[in-house]
Amino acid sequence: MLKKFDKKDEESGGGSNPLQHLEKSAVLQEARVFNETPINPRKCAHILTKILYLINQGEHLGTTEATEAFFAMTKLFQSNDPTLRRMCYLTIKEMSCIAEDVIIVTSSLTKDMTGKEDNYRGPAVRALCQITDSTMLQAVERYMKQAIVDKVPSVSSSALVSSLHLLKCSFDVVKRWVNEAQEAASSDNIMVQYHALGLLYHVRKNDRLAVSKMISKFTRHGLKSPFAYCMMIRVASKQLEEEDGSRDSPLFDFIESCLRNKHEMVVYEAASAIVNLPGCSAKELAPAVSVLQLFCSSPKAALRYAAVRTLNKVAMKHPSAVTACNLDLENLVTDSNRSIATLAITTLLKTGSESSIDRLMKQISSFMSEISDEFKVVVVQAISALCQKYPRKHAVLMNFLFTMLREEGGFEYKRAIVDCIISIIEENSESKETGLSHLCEFIEDCEFTVLATRILHLLGQEGPKTNNPSKYIRFIYNRVVLEHEEVRAGAVSALAKFGAQNEEMLPSILVLLKRCVMDDDNEVRDRATFYLNVLEQKQKALNAGYILNGLTVSIPGLEKALQQYTLEPSEKPFDLKSVPLATTPMTEQRPESTSTAAVKQPEKVAATRQEIFQEQLAAVPEFQGLGPLFKSSPEPVALTESETEYVIRCTKHTFSDHLVFQFDCTNTLNDQTLENVTVQMEPTEAYEVLSYVPVRSLPYNQPGTCYTLVALPKEDPTAVACTFSCVMKFTVKDCDPNTGEIDEEGYEDEYVLEDLEVTVADHIQKVMKVNFEAAWDEVGDEFEKEETFTLSTIKTLEEAVGNIVKFLGMHPCERSDKVPENKNTHTLLLAGVFRGGHDILVRSRLLLLDTVTMQVTARSSEELPVDIILASVG
């Protein structure tokens, strides 16, 4: 009799698993029973179960002991007990990678595979293929072909699925079984047809034409298996994406025709495929949306869930296409399945009108406590999208978010809410104080370090700009008193930012920082001491440079440069300008934390794209004296069409006095090899080409890189914009495409490329200034210049802002790239660093009448960057 456990034991798992406390040595000792005569099937099957359990629990079996157990197990083939035989097949598959000489069972498996007992044949095929390698496969090829076309569906399916696994190691052999697979694909059995279709596709998937023919054949003659239809829909949609085909394609017609299939599975798969096709218009989505609308009223919960989840996805890009389903979605809000109700609500939030928000919020709040954190995050994301769509509703949405914030929940859920509140604060200045107050209350009882430090950073950034900044000090200082060291350090930094921006509060802040100097933690003490000394100087420039804006360099780059400096001692002081600049704000230069516990950081920080380029260029002897790399263009520029015989892409690398053009070349002609490849450049301005670094050899389809080194203008340093004409020159040597043999003699040839533009943006690296006003004061007005321009071809402020940001290649600060609605004036604030490490700031005041008038004020620590900005705009 089995012992009856109560519910508590069941839930805890205590005592409910009879195999829980197995010992490997004892089980292997028991395996000697396999050698006894007569065989006891029940006892042997139980021992095999124990062995399988140990393996699946991760227990390590040594090669010798596994081999001994495996050889003993082979004697069990003498028994005809069906249960024991099936257990043998399972054990063979599990131990095939552990034991040695497993091929000893090949003859036994082949015998079962070709025998009369259908229950043995399918599992025997699977086990045989598991132990067969590429060298043995040809010996059983005949049996596999027979099994694929076998009349017994389980045998045929086993052979087809096993063939699919064998493709990875023996593609050429399995490819010869295509005729048998095609015969199996016409089977009446739904699983056989599905598996056969899968094998055919994977054999042909690298041949686009063969895949197209296969789709055409099976869509024309029809399929019996709904699984096969689903497979064909996925293949067709993938083919459509790769071909970037129009919606007039037969493939799209096939997918659309599946919306009328009698199987619900196929109908949903077709609707899902259409919805996920890139660039689908609302008109093309309409049939799929209609089908999903019908599924919303299905009695099957799975169908309702699938429909509403897919509609939710459609609503992100095409909310108007889902509006017709609003009535059905509203009916699902009261669905007994909370997952369906949540998705229905979030979909309605994306498609509903402003007037329906209050009602929807009430409905959501009625069951928020009953759904999982995963779905709560979905709700928060929908509310975030709603905030951007209807900014006037921020008060209602903010209150709802704060109510959610006070409830129990995991890290991801709370982070989603905090992200949403912060985005509302940034998008809507009216909601700033309300949002900050809610966040202050949250950190009073916040168990997540990452969120607490992030909110403290936000308070230090936004709090001093509010009408009553002193009210936040109590919340921040409470963190110094009550929290652990990471949060205390964040609180000290936040306090310092209040002192740096508010002279009235400075004495109080200094008192608080003096208390922090005695903290137990080094980091907290060091921060407090540093900020205290800076603030006591009462200099705006120091406050801006060391407290409000801080470093604009790459943290991994700084770490690497400092390590290099300590390894190679020098009399010269460490030059911060030798460190690559940060392309993201400092707070984002860390891995995303996904738990509340301290996450172990990787020992080595992954190199950035610019650091990789720096190392590659430093390895070229011609570039040794160029100094540190200032900037690399974010995206390579294509100088040829993608379908031409040579594919050339250029990346521009900017140094303090030079430009290096990196040309990544690919030869797409299989009957030619190119040698000594260079790209000759002719500038239109005062640039001077200094040298070329060729690609010595460029065989077929093997990328190579050549470089051109150019000196920047010296006579007129403001003339940084330039157009280069480019010609690729090389020696052609013919080669045999089959053998790869190259002719000894070649001939000179050239290939004209597209012109290459160098703009002012190539000389400026964008940097983020959290506090633009402080940075503006820090740079000073010694080299300030101002000019007014008319943008005659631009008709909107949004277009003007976008063009200016793109043209200058600078970072918009304080969200000034967002133009408020119904305004005819706007101020754009831009920050960057000019090559050589000189800060450059631009304040652009825009006025919209008939055209846009722009007043540009530029400041820098040197005169040249200011002159270049104004000259380039003019």
Swiss-Prot record:
Family, per entry: Belongs to the COPG family.
* Assembly notes: Oligomeric complex that consists of at least the alpha, beta, beta', gamma, delta, epsilon and zeta subunits. Interacts with ZNF289/ARFGAP2 through its C-terminal appendage domain. Interacts with EGFR upon EGF treatment; interaction is essential for regulation of EGF-dependent nuclear transport of EGFR by retrograde trafficking from the Golgi to the ER. The coatomer interacts with KDEL receptors; the interaction is important for retrograde trafficking of KDEL-bearing proteins from the Golgi to the endoplasmic reticulum. Interacts with COPB1. Interacts with TMED10 (via C-terminus).
Provide the protein's localization: Cytoplasm, Cytosol; Golgi apparatus membrane; Cytoplasmic vesicle, COPI-coated vesicle membrane
Pfam families for the chain: Adaptin_N (PF01602), Coatomer_g_Cpla (PF16381), COP-gamma_platf (PF08752)
Q: What does this protein do?
A: The coatomer is a cytosolic protein complex that binds to dilysine motifs and reversibly associates with Golgi non-clathrin-coated vesicles, which further mediate biosynthetic protein transport from the ER, via the Golgi up to the trans Golgi network. Coatomer complex is required for budding from Golgi membranes, and is essential for the retrograde Golgi-to-ER transport of dilysine-tagged proteins.
Q: Which GO terms describe its biological process?
A: endoplasmic reticulum to Golgi vesicle-mediated transport; establishment of Golgi localization; intra-Golgi vesicle-mediated transport; intracellular protein transport; organelle transport along microtubule; protein secretion
Q: Keywords in UniProt for this one?
A: Cytoplasm, Cytoplasmic vesicle, ER-Golgi transport, Golgi apparatus, Membrane, Phosphoprotein, Protein transport, Repeat, Transport
- Supply the source organism's classification: Eukaryota, Metazoa, Chordata, Craniata, Vertebrata
Annotated region Interaction with ZNF289/ARFGAP2: the residues are: 609-874
**Recorded topology in the membrane:** Peripheral membrane protein
Species: Rattus norvegicus
Q: What is this protein called?
A: Coatomer subunit gamma-1
Q: Where are the HEAT repeats?
A: 64-101, 283-320, 322-355, 356-392
Instruction: Tell me which residues bear Phosphothreonine.
Output: T594
Biased composition regions of type Basic and acidic residues, renumbered to the chain: 1-11
Cited InterPro entries: ARM-like, ARM-type_fold, Clathrin/coatomer_adapt-like_N, Clathrin_app_Ig-like_sf, Coatomer/calthrin_app_sub_C, Coatomer_g_Cpla, Coatomer_gsu, Coatomer_gsu_app_Ig-like_dom
